[in-house]
From Swiss-Prot:
Disulphide linkage map: none
Source species, domain of life: Eukaryota
Keywords: Acetylation, Activator, Nucleus, Repeat, Transcription, Transcription regulation
A GO term from the CC aspect: nucleus
Compositional bias annotation for Low complexity: 9-21
UniProt entry tagged with the keyword Transcription: yes
Protein name per Swiss-Prot or TrEMBL: Transcription regulatory protein SNF11
């Protein structure tokens, strides 16, 4: 009979230990479940906020920067071609002092525009190489000598956008 009592006490102790251990596991499991639920809710809220704001990815930002720089370059090159044609017309006509000054001014503008194209191409190269802080050396719109820029000039607006894009991203 003493062996039955000893066996009975052993079972009671084991059952109590299992109950305590089981309760501890339940508490820890609940704490982990709550922590996981909170983490999942935070991740879902962040994902929803990102989806609502529609923030571009890093690759999309790079692509937008390159597209903007290429668009600016296409406008700059179109204007260089236009100025070069004007320059050729001035050279074909009789050259006098007033035309000579005009020719020099046009050559300076062409040089300025081509420097901008070169700076933009360097920036595109750096962006494609993965340099995160790459930005063009010239972020201001070109100033046309002896002419006021009209407020609707697309190049001025694109340079303003360019400055903002490279400032934010």
């Amino acid at each position: 009979m003493s062996s039955e009592i000893a066996y009975s006490n052993t079972n009671t102790n084991t059952e109590n230990e299992n109950r305590n251990t089981g309760a501890g596991v339940d508490v820890n499991t609940n704490a982990n479940a709550n922590a996981n639920a909170t983490a999942n809710a935070t991740a879902n809220a962040t994902a929803n906020a990102t989806a609502e704001l529609n923030l571009p990815t890093v690759d999309e930002q790079r692509q937008y920067k390159v597209q903007l720089l290429l668009h600016i370059n296409s406008i700059l090159l179109a204007r260089v071609i236009q100025m070069n044609n004007s320059l050729q017309n001035n050279l074909q006509n009789n050259i006098n002092n007033s035309n000579n000054n005009n020719i020099i001014r046009i050559q300076q503008l062409i040089s300025q525009f081509l420097k901008r194209v070169h700076a933009n191409l360097q920036c595109i190269s750096q962006i494609n190489q993965g340099v995160p802080s790459a930005k063009p050396l010239i972020l201001t719109p070109p100033q046309l000598a002896n002419q006021q820029q009209p407020p609707q000039d697309i190049l001025s607006k694109l340079y303003l956008l360019l400055a903002r894009v490279f400032e934010i991203w």
